[in-house]
């Protein structure tokens, strides 16, 4: 049954590809620059929030309303052919959020997919995309920037992930920071994720290579090699949002 289902999905996508192949290049370009609201069936809601000198663009999306043809709006739709449904919906919502963020800087393009699966931004700007549940988040800046959004860990998840995220020294700092440990560990994870994304050259650095030095009500200070990184953070309902920018 699974094999047959996979074959049906593959055939469906191939039919969509063949359909697009019949459209002229000029027409495809026009479609991609037009409003995605007229081309994407997946239901989305856009909101924005000022944070740490930037505007965060949130897109809430309904995965149940997603259709395979929604991907045809993306210039790189073929690269998602073998992705799972969850990946496709998150990716689409993230790119929609990125479009809103890029409009602030006068761009009308969709970030492509890089060799490391990272978003490829237009020359002259940097950006970052994150997902959590049915929420996608994007931000754009003139300097390297990283953004992350995470649902606060449960107590069990926090226990299971602790040793993969923080060192014993960091554990002690977090235990003394005044936050419930699941929240503190979620913040540590998210802050390190944003710091990694903000690195212009993303290496194979481990989470433990990013050391949390201190925390206050607005920032987490992270040390990596010879630099200190300030990561802004806030709690929005049951999620943690972090942002790191390299000056």
Listing of model-derived features with the role each one plays in the protein:
Residues 21, 26-247:
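Core catalytic alpha/beta fold that binds nucleotide/phospho-ligands
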